[in-house]
A protein has these predicted regions:
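Central mid-sequence intracellular linker of multi-pass
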Residues: 2-11, 15-17, 50-57, 187, ...
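Glycine-rich segments within core transmembrane alpha-helices of 12-TM secondary carriers
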Residues: 186-216, 220-223, 227-232, 236, ...
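Conserved MFS/SLC helix-loop-helix module at the cytosolic interface between two early adjacent transmembrane helices
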Residues: 112-153
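Cytoplasmic helix-loop-helix junction between adjacent transmembrane helices
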Residues: 159-198
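Cytosolic juxtamembrane N-terminal segment immediately preceding the first transmembrane helix
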Residues: 1-77, 90
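Extracytoplasmic
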Residues: 58-96, 170, 174, 337-344
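Short hydrophobic/alpha-helical segments at membrane-entry points of transmembrane helices
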Residues: 151-160, 221-222, 325, 429-434
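C-terminal transmembrane bundle
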Residues: 74-75, 104-107, 111, 118, ...
Length: 540
């Protein structure tokens, strides 16, 4: 039982249990330039087109393109109108709820087409989905420009919904693309950056959009974002090759003998260890030229049909780990993001009386909180590596979970202090509110990073579908709350809303305790289920 994790006493290979720190029993495995970190997953030995074998600069450029476009197409559109929600209701002559629905319907589209994007990515690769998303995101912005210039709510709503078509692929596939590009020990910081695009950058967008709306008018927001859309589209075409790869299954072995450093009485670990099989009997495949990598499609990556793949997505809901990530990441992020629907409603009235620009500057707190939360990735790597060393070089995916404690502390600090602040209104109370919003942002980003890494480590082959489910739940919640949260806040008060957020958040984070203890048992159980039952064997 390594550090409270219940062991299953089974020698069969298991994803998420790996030799990560070199010892004598792993001496045949490639490492990182002589350092004692073993490469997980093992790269191809006969195909230089494996993304894991790309030059470092090429992988970093691909990641930078993912990161930039995640901001431009996924993070930017939603909060763009948040600071001016209250003011736009008067400008367009519609209720505040209808202004919130400009974002709500957009996010409903994102969630609704998520399964289709997932199966198309599995079948034809991620690049076609990214290209489609970049094109539709740009077209949606153009339609929003037309609608805003005409003060036409319906045209503006249509543009926002088309922007939603351009959001789905970036929000749902970027995290699994990180798993395509990087080894296990390289993912922490990059995963934290990807989480930050959804928790941190919306805040800086709100800050900038509030100031721009106050100075230049709300129509300028869409005009200013169009050049960034075009740059993102060009970057997708020329800098983001296909990251999906059909890697030949490595030859696996289970380790029946204890590593030499282990004590005689130690329990025998179950390991997923890759041996190099020596020189391959097949000739090495030719490296693709740059022009070949620009092709919109590069073939198919599975022999399954679209309907078959579509039906498989929801099978993953039988996995307790999937339910867990939906709770500690999907729901928590949704609660934080929908708070943007009501902040303008809170601060635009006495005793605060903030204007549109000042409503935007309120998000400075959450921006700083999200920025500081990028340490969650390296911290998660450090804790996992430390526990791995103490565990005789054997990595368990559950070593990602302990930093959830930090998330729980800051989430509680943020929401419950925010509750007290709005229940005791003062003219400068928005300053404490900004701090609370930042603390909540930090507290939510940490568990989201840890949960994302846990899924990439434990269920790498199913990560695309799992992140799609997470994205669907999150965006359906966004839409659902947009239909009633403004009226709920007006009736029961913002303090009641934030108290509810705090209680729900702590209850959901508490599920990390059984996941840490029984996570390995669950991984073994799901591995057995995948092997035994046909429907699960198909998704595995």
């Amino acid at each position: 039982m390594p550090f409270g994790i219940i062991d299953t006493r089974n020698d069969a290979p298991l994803a998420g249990t790996e030799y990560l720190i070199r010892d004598d029993s792993a001496s045949s495995l490639p490492d990182v330039d002589g350092i004692d970190t073993i490469l997980v997953p093992q790269p191809s030995d006969d195909d230089p087109n494996d993304p894991l074998l790309w030059p470092t600069w090429k992988r970093e450029i691909a990641f930078a393109t993912l990161f930039f476009n995640n901001i431009i197409f996924a993070a930017l559109p939603g909060p763009m109108l948040a600071p001016s929600t209250f003011a736009l209701a008067g400008i367009l002559g519609v209720p505040v709820t209808m202004i919130s629905e400009l974002s709500g319907y957009q996010l409903l589209i994102v969630g609704a087409i998520g399964p289709l994007v997932s199966v198309l990515a599995q079948k034809y690769g991620k690049r076609p989905q990214f290209l489609f998303a970049a094109v539709t995101g740009t077209i949606g912005t153009i339609i929003c420009i037309i609608g805003s210039q005409r003060y036409n709510y319906n045209t503006l709503l249509a543009g926002r919904m088309i922007q939603g078509l351009g959001t789905t692929a970036w929000e749902s596939l970027s995290m699994s693309a990180v798993g395509d590009l990087l080894y296990l020990h390289e993912r922490g910081l990059r995963t934290a950056f990807m989480v930050a695009t959804l928790t941190c950058t919306p805040s800086i967008v709100s800050i900038i959009s509030g100031a721009m709306t106050q100075a230049c008018g709300w129509q300028s927001l869409f005009v200013a974002s169009l050049p960034f859309n075009i740059v993102g589209l060009i970057g997708t075409i020329f800098l983001l090759p296909e990251t999906q790869f059909r890697r030949s299954p490595p030859r696996l072995r289970s380790v029946s003998e204890k590593p030499v450093e282990m004590a005689q009485g130690a329990e025998k670990p179950e390991l997923s260890v890759v041996e190099m099989a020596g020189p391959t009997s097949q000739p090495q495949k030719p490296r693709q030229t740059y022009l070949q990598t620009l092709a919109p499609m590069s073939g198919t990556y599975t022999d399954k049909g679209i309907l078959h793949l579509l039906s498989e997505i929801f099978v993953h809901l039988a996995n307790p780990a999937v339910i867990w990530i939906l709770l500690v990441s999907g729901v928590l992020i949704a609660l934080f993001v929908v708070s943007a629907y009501i902040t303008s409603q809170i601060w635009s009235v006495p005793p605060y009386n903030l204007n549109i620009a000042q409503n935007g500057f309120f998000y400075t707190g959450s921006f700083l909180g999200g920025l500081l939360a990028t340490v969650a990735g390296p911290l998660c790597d450090w804790t996992a590596r430390t526990l791995t060393r103490l565990n005789h070089g054997i990595f368990e995916a559950e070593f990602r979970i302990p930093i959830m404690i930090i998330g729980a502390v800051f989430t509680a600090l943020g929401w419950f202090t925010f509750m007290w602040d709005v229940e005791h209104p003062r003219p400068n109370g928005y300053l404490l509110g900004a701090f609370c919003h930042g603390a909540a942002c930090f507290g939510i980003s940490v568990p989201s990073t840890a949960a994302g890494l846990y899924i990439l480590d434990s269920f790498p082959k199913q990560s695309t579908e799992i992140f799609i489910l997470q994205m669907m739940l999150k965006n359906f919640l966004f839409y659902a709350f947009s239909t009633f949260i403004n009226s709920w806040t007006a009736e029961d008060g913002a303090g009641f809303v934030f108290r509810t957020w705090g209680i729900v958040s702590l209850c959901l984070l508490a599920t990390s305790i059984p996941m840490y203890i029984f996570g390995k048992v669950n991984r073994r159980m799901m591995s057995n289920v995948h092997a035994k039952y046909r429907i699960f064997r198909a998704v595995a």
